[in-house]
A protein has these predicted regions:
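A short, Lys/Arg-rich alpha-helix, primarily the initiator
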Residues: 1-18
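Domain-edge interaction signal
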Residues: 3, 11, 35, 39-257
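Short alpha-helical "recognition helix" segments of helix-turn-helix
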Residues: 15, 21-30, 37
């Protein structure tokens, strides 16, 4: 395995720091020999399997959280609680991750990573439309699997979606009301209807290129799009969102017929 493909020593150190866990406890959590992480930090090269596992931990706090819950008996109670606090803190650093978590909690984990993508889009759009404020900073990307927030999708797809209590200060009162309205509205529709609606929305958006030449829909384009549709459909209150989505889904059914 080429050295450049292997997780680096600084990256392993970041895992230990991010999740407040020692070298031996991390090895125990992973079910490895207790000196494994120590050896890697001293310069031993991990196998591809072990390196990939560590990269998953580095890139996905959710994946680490799942591992921690499943194998907490491998740690002392003190080590478990310290690491749990750290990983939950890491997850709350991301606004888009916390917006997704709001929906996971609302649906009591009965939602998929793919469905969350559409709810994030409409939440962002109506936040820009009503309040001129973005809920999160991630840009909408055009992807082949219709996942505009692909990094989050990849993270949510690598482990079961779990409920955990959110700090009440994460969202403002108006943001929480908007997210609740979106959650309640989409609770009436299945995956197929939600995906078809997402596909139709994507076809109406103005696409541009970012610095890396990725196809994206800018925040300003989403704002313009939603303000226009809100004016056209007379959406003046949060409660009007339900009627708009219902109308859009019915139009899709008629188009299919």
């Amino acid at each position: 395995m080429a050295r450049e493909e292997v997780i680096s020593i600084p990256e392993i150190a970041a895992i230990l720091n991010n999740y407040r866990i020692g070298k031996k406890p991390l090895a125990k959590l992973l079910g490895w020999g207790e000196t494994t992480i120590i050896r890697y930090m001293d310069g031993d090269v991990p196998t591809k399997e072990y390196s990939d596992k560590l990269k998953m931990l580095l890139n996905s706090p959710l994946y680490y959280y799942e591992l921690l819950l499943n194998y907490k008996d491998n740690l002392t109670d003190v080590a478990f609680k310290k690491s749990k606090k750290a990983v939950l803190g890491k997850m709350t650093e991301s606004r888009i991750r916390m917006t997704a978590q709001f929906f996971i909690n609302y649906y009591h984990e009965e939602i998929t990573a793919l469905q969350i993508q559409t709810l994030l889009y409409f939440s962002q759009g109506f936040s820009l439309g009503f309040y001129d404020t973005a809920l999160f900073e991630e840009e909408y990307r055009i992807t082949t699997n219709n996942c505009p927030y692909i990094a989050l999708f990849d993270e949510l797809s690598c482990a079961p979606l779990r409920y955990f209590e959110l700090d009440e200060k994460i969202f403002t009162e108006k943001e929480e009301k908007l997210l609740t309205e979106i959650a309640e509205t989409f609770s009436w529709y299945g995956t197929k209807a939600i995906q078809k609606l997402a596909e139709k929305e994507r076809s109406t958006l103005k696409i541009s290129r970012d610095k890396e030449n990725n196809k994206v829909v800018t925040e300003n384009s989403i704002r313009t799009h939603f303000k226009k549709l809100m004016e056209q459909d007379g959406i003046k209150e949060l409660s009007d969102i339900e009627g708009y989505i219902e109308k859009a889904v019915l139009e899709l059914k008629h188009e299919k017929a």
